[in-house]
Structures are given as structure tokens and as C-alpha cells.
């Protein structure tokens, strides 16, 4: 008896193995972290490499408020974000932070530096800590995108409709209210 192979054994492993982006800086970073992932036995470099290879929608932005909340309990660590660090106007005082990210918005950079913190690039981070010691990997919420609100197609998932207008006549009746036949 043979084993039942899905698609006759031609199933590829998930996840990207190569960078799709044409960004030369990103290409250099991938080259650097491929080398480090191969030569060091620490999972930090493998995780950073995996996240660098991800599509842009998985490099979600992280606000300064969330960043500072995560770093409260780790005052001497460097926050590593494979994505963008954005400013948050609701935050009055930014604590002293050490941040390494692919991109940092202009306002966020000014606020971090004004509080006595530092903003590092990935090559500076590698020079300082090649095995990821005293580093905390953080990521933004990938499901917070506007597009994701339209995807909920499970039962009672309440997906957001694509409508040209939000008036009385537009996708407000059948299937949306119990009083109009049924509510999905």
C-alpha cells in the first residue's frame, strides 16, 4: 500500500525564500541577514530574515505609544521593528527609547531623539549586537488594515460592504436586519 500524497507530492513549502522587492537597501539587508542566519546559531537573525522577506502588508506600522508600552518592562533593550515606526499625537511624553526600524517617520524620529533616545539602522544594530542580544522584536498589527475589514466571510463575521454610498437604500436591508427577511 502506498501513501496518499497530496498533488502527487508536488506541494511546496509555504513562505518566501527570495525577496520580491526591487529596493536595493532591502536587498543588501537580506544578503546580510542570510549570512548571519547561516553563520550564527541564534534564532533572532532567522526571524529578522523571514520578516524582511515578507510582503509589505506584513510589515505593518507600529505607533510610538504601542512601542513604549511594550518597552516599559525592558528599559535597556533595543526595540527592533521590521516596518515603520509612526508618531502618536495622543502621547504627551515619549520615554527614552532605543529603536531600530526599516523606516521611522520624521515626527517619530524627532520625538525619540528629543527624549534622549536613539534611532538605529539595521547595519548599526548588527555591528552592535550580531546575535540579537538585548533586542526585542516587535511588530505592528497586520489585521488593522482597512482592506481586512471587508474579508470577514465566516458566519456572523459582519464584513464591511464595498458601497458607493452609506444611505438608506444601500446594503441596509435584506440580510442586514432581522426585520428584513434575515440577518446573516
From Swiss-Prot:
Family: Belongs to the eukaryotic ribosomal protein eL18 family.
Any one GO CC term of the record: cytosolic large ribosomal subunit
Name of the protein: Large ribosomal subunit protein eL18
Keywords: Cytoplasm, Ribonucleoprotein, Ribosomal protein
Organism: Theileria annulata
Region feature (Disordered): 156-184
UniProt keyword Membrane present: no
Cited Pfam families: Ribosomal_L18
UniProt-listed GO biological process terms: translation
GO-annotated molecular function: RNA binding; structural constituent of ribosome
Compositionally biased region (Basic residues): 174-184
Localization in the cell: Cytoplasm
Amino acid at each position: 500500500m502506498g501513501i496518499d500524497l497530496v498533488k502527487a507530492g508536488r506541494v511546496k513549502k509555504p513562505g518566501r525564500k527570495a525577496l520580491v522587492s526591487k529596493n536595493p537597501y532591502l536587498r543588501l539587508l537580506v544578503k546580510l541577514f542570510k549570512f548571519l542566519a547561516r553563520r550564527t546559531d541564534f534564532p533572532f537573525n532567522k526571524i529578522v530574515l523571514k520578516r524582511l522577506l515578507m510582503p509589505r502588508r506584513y510589515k505593518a506600522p507600529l505607533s510610538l505609544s504601542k512601542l513604549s508600552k511594550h518597552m516599559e518592562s525592558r528599559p535597556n533593550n533595543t526595540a527592533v521593528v521590521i516596518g515603520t515606526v509612526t508618531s502618536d499625537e495622543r502621547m504627551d511624553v515619549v520615554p527614552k527609547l532605543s529603536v531600530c526600524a526599516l523606516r521611522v517617520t520624521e515626527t517619530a524620529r524627532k520625538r525619540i531623539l528629543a527624549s534622549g533616545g536613539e534611532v538605529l539602522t539595521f547595519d548599526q544594530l548588527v555591528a552592535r549586537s550580531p546575535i540579537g542580544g538585548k533586542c526585542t522584536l516587535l511588530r505592528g498589527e497586520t489585521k488593522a488594515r482597512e482592506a481586512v475589514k471587508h474579508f470577514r466571510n465566516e458566519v456572523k463575521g459582519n464584513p464591511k460592504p464595498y458601497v458607493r454610498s452609506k444611505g438608506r437604500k444601500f446594503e441596509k436591508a435584506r440580510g442586514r436586519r432581522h426585520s428584513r427577511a434575515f440577518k446573516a
